[in-house]
Amino acid sequence: MRSHFFTVLALTALVVPDGARADWLQFRGPNGNGSIAGNENLPTELSEKSIAWKVPLPGRGLGSPIIVGDRVFVTAASGPDQNLLQVLCFSSTDGAELWRRSFWATGRTMCQKKTCVAAPTPVSDGVRLYALWSSNDLICLDLDGNLVWTRGLTLDYPNASNSLGMASSPIIVGDTLVAQIENDSESFAAGFDLKSGTNKWKIDRPKAANWTSPVVLKSGGTLVVALQSSKGVLGVAPATGSEIWNYSKGASTIPSGAAAGDTLYVPSKGLTALRPGAGGGETTLLWNKKTQNPSTASPLISGDKVYIINSTGVLSATNRADGERLWRVRLKGPFSGSPVASDNGHLYIFNEEGVGQCVDLSGAEGSVVSEIELGETIISTASISGDALYIRSDGSLWKIAGLPPSKGEAEAKSQSAP
């Protein structure tokens, strides 16, 4: 393997407090399905008063923010050719920039106009940060921004690219970083050692452009990585890349699947629920609903339902057990990002025009209860941490939070506590 060390253009340092809590560490949250537990106090009355802070970003990015303890991390790409790759760290409290690192891209930076080089979402194990760009540059930093290792994957795999841009986000399973570098030429998926960045495994993948991200699910009590492509979904062992099961009836190449327990909900001929067989056993097709067809947004799993948004901006709630559609509500689109939810009974989604919508999921039918207009283009998916939403637009990073309790409310809460 040939490692390529980038030129570090800026160096600062900040100590991470001991015991910092990692919460939203990857694309679509801790479970990779858009939902998170324990955030009951997220704002439901979205308005300008909900904006806790807004900070400018030096370049475009489609990747979501990730949150580790009290820090928010985003990637960006700037310059006329988007060849300046950047990682930025902000305080979640006030949006203060804590550090930024800049690197020169070693791979191709050509992209379709709507997307950009900083399309993948970074991932963290709570100790280090791993960032991948469309240029196939893979960088590992510690949480102080110190460089640990880099891989210029184009140096090792020179034909691994497509003219539209890459967007698949890496994930971490155990001590392995899994990434899909799928395209119409040198297409592959690989597992990288977290500490060194060296290949643990590499497998060939279908030669076709693909923007989906890997998903983890349990299969027979064992964690399996699901790799989605136009051919279907392949389940592999995260440590070795060896095949465990294969669903070969096709799937989408834009919205990714979502898992809950041992069940995978895949955008495949509409929406398909699968229970893969353990140890290479037969995969069970639980149900398929051709009329429930996700568009760009990936399915969201929250409670006993799976939520999808179709190409006309209609949000549907589906019973996870049997695929029955329970209700539909029309949202203001268009959408490129995916919905997220917490256990406060509400769903959040931002459209391409910068309008954030909060949907109450607690009733017999969903209803939009509030909106916020940020006035900037948003192609990304929001993240959740504590009692706040974090969303990046083309030019800014935003924190959306509820209003702090009044003095009287705080005193009443204190008096009612045991």
Regions found by a protein language model. Name each.
Residues T7-V16:
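Bacterial N-terminal signal peptides
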Residues M1-T7:
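Bacterial N-terminal signal peptides that target proteins for export
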Residues D18-P418:
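Noncatalytic, solvent-exposed loop/strand surfaces
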